[in-house]
C-alpha cells in the first residue's frame, strides 16, 4: 500500500563530507528544493565559517532557511521545526520534492518526529547560575556537567553552544527528566514519508579534509568575516557559539595567538564531525553511503537517486 504521507528526502553527514555538491546534483534529478539542515546558516554575514552554498554553486536549485536572521537574533529548535514544516508544505504545494540537507541532528529530528517543546518553562535563577559557571569555568566545564547528567543531549549539542547546553540542564533541573527522556516519551513515528541518506567517509580522510577546509576558509577571508561581527560587538549571541567564530574571538580578544586559535578550530571541527556520525547512527534510520576517495561521484549520485526513487515510488 502506498504511503500517503508527504515525501521528504533527508541528506545528512558530518562536516566536510561533501553534502553540498552531491545534494545539488540530486535535487536537479529529483525536481527538489533544498532546506538547510544547519543551525548556523540561518544567520546573515556568516558565510565562510558556516560553509554556505554560493549562488553559483546552487546551479539554480532553490535553497531555504539561509540568511534569514541577524547574528544578534536567537533561534531555537522549536523555531526551526515550525519554519521547516511550513517550508515542506510550501515546496510540496509547488509540485516539488522537499529535501533537507545538513548536519544538525537534533534540528532535523525535531522536524521528522512529533516533538513538542516547552520553550517558555524554566528557572531564570538556575539559568543565571549556569551562565556564571560558563563565564568562570568555561564552556567545556558546563558541557561536562551536561555530559554527566544527559550524555545523549551532550552528544547532540556542541560545547560551544552554551545556550543550548544551559537549556538542556535547565530542562533537567525543572522537570527532573533529561531532554533525551522528554524526547523518548513523545511519539516516535515519522510524520513524513522520509528517505534518510547519510554520507560517511574514512575517519582519517575526513579529518584531513576538515583541516584543509579550515585552511581554505582562512585563505578566503574567515578572519575578516569574524572581525566584522567582532567590531559590531556581536558577543553573547547564539550565532557566535558556532565553530570558527568562538575560537577566532579568543584570538581577537588577545587571549591566544592565531595559530593556537586555528588549531583549536580544527580540533573542534574534527570532534564535532565524530559526534555527528555517532549521533546520526544512533538516532535516525539512515541508509549510509561511503564517500571515501577515490569515488565516482556521478555513480554515487545515480545509486542514491535510484534508492530514493524506489522508496518514494517516483
From Swiss-Prot:
Catalyzes the transfer of a dimethylallyl group onto the adenine at position 37 in tRNAs that read codons beginning with uridine, leading to the formation of N6-(dimethylallyl)adenosine (i(6)A). Substrate binds at residues 15-20. The keyword Metal-binding does not apply. ATP binds at residues 13-20. One of its GO terms (molecular function) is tRNA dimethylallyltransferase activity. It comes from the Bacteria. SUPFAM superfamilies: P-loop containing nucleoside triphosphate hydrolases. This is tRNA dimethylallyltransferase. Belongs to the IPP transferase family. Residues 38-41 are annotated as: Interaction with substrate tRNA. The record marks 104, 127 as: Interaction with substrate tRNA. It catalyses: adenosine(37) in tRNA + dimethylallyl diphosphate = N(6)-dimethylallyladenosine(37) in tRNA + diphosphate. Its EC number is 2.5.1.75. Monomer. Its cofactor is Mg(2+). Keywords: ATP-binding, Magnesium, Nucleotide-binding, Transferase, tRNA processing. Pfam families: IPPT (PF01715). GO terms for biological process: tRNA modification. It is an enzyme of class 2 (transferase).
Amino acid at each position: 500500500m502506498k504511503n500517503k504521507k508527504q515525501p521528504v528526502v533527508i541528506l545528512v553527514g558530518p562536516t566536510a563530507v561533501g553534502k553540498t555538491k552531491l545534494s545539488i546534483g540530486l535535487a536537479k534529478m529529483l525536481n527538489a528544493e533544498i532546506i538547510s539542515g544547519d543551525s548556523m546558516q540561518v544567520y546573515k554575514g556568516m558565510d565562510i565559517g558556516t560553509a554556505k552554498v554560493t549562488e553559483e554553486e546552487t546551479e539554480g536549485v532553490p535553497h531555504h532557511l539561509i540568511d534569514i536572521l541577524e547574528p544578534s537574533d536567537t533561534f531555537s529548535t522549536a523555531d526551526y521545526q515550525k519554519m521547516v514544516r511550513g517550508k515542506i508544505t510550501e515546496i510540496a504545494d509547488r509540485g516539488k520534492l522537499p529535501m533537507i540537507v545538513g548536519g544538525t541532528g537534533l534540528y532535523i529530528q525535531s522536524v521528522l518526529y512529533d516533538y513538542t517543546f516547552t520553550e517558555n518553562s524554566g528557572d531564570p535563577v538556575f539559568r543565571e547560575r549556569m551562565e556564571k559557571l560558563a563565564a568562570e569555568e568555561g564552556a567545556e566545564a558546563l558541557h561536562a556537567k551536561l555530559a554527566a547528567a544527559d550524555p545523549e543531549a551532550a552528544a547532540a549539542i556542541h560545547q560551544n553552544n552554551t545556550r543550548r547546553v544551559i537549556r538542556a540542564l535547565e530542562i533537567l533541573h525543572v522537570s527532573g527528566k533529561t531532554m533525551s527522556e522528554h524526547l523518548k516519551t513523545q511519539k516516535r513515528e515519522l510524520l513524513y514519508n522520509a528517505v534518510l541518506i547519510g554520507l560517511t567517509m574514512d575517519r582519517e580522510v575526513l579529518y584531513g579534509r576538515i583541516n584543509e577546509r579550515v585552511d581554505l576558509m582562512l585563505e578566503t577571508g574567515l578572519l575578516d568575516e569574524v572581525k566584522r561581527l567582532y567590531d559590531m560587538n556581536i558577543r553573547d549571541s547564539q550565532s557566535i557559539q558556532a565553530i570558527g567564530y568562538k575560537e577566532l574571538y579568543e584570538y581577537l580578544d588577545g587571549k591566544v595567538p592565531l595559530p593556537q586559535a586555528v588549531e583549536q578550530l580544527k580540533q573542534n571541527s574534527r570532534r564535532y564531525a565524530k559526534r555527528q556520525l555517532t549521533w546520526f547512527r544512533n538516532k535516525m534510520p539512515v541508509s549510509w553511503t561511503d564517500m571515501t576517495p577515490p569515488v565516482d561521484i556521478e555513480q554515487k549520485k545515480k545509486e542514491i537517486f535510484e534508492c530514493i526513487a524506489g522508496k518514494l515510488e517516483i
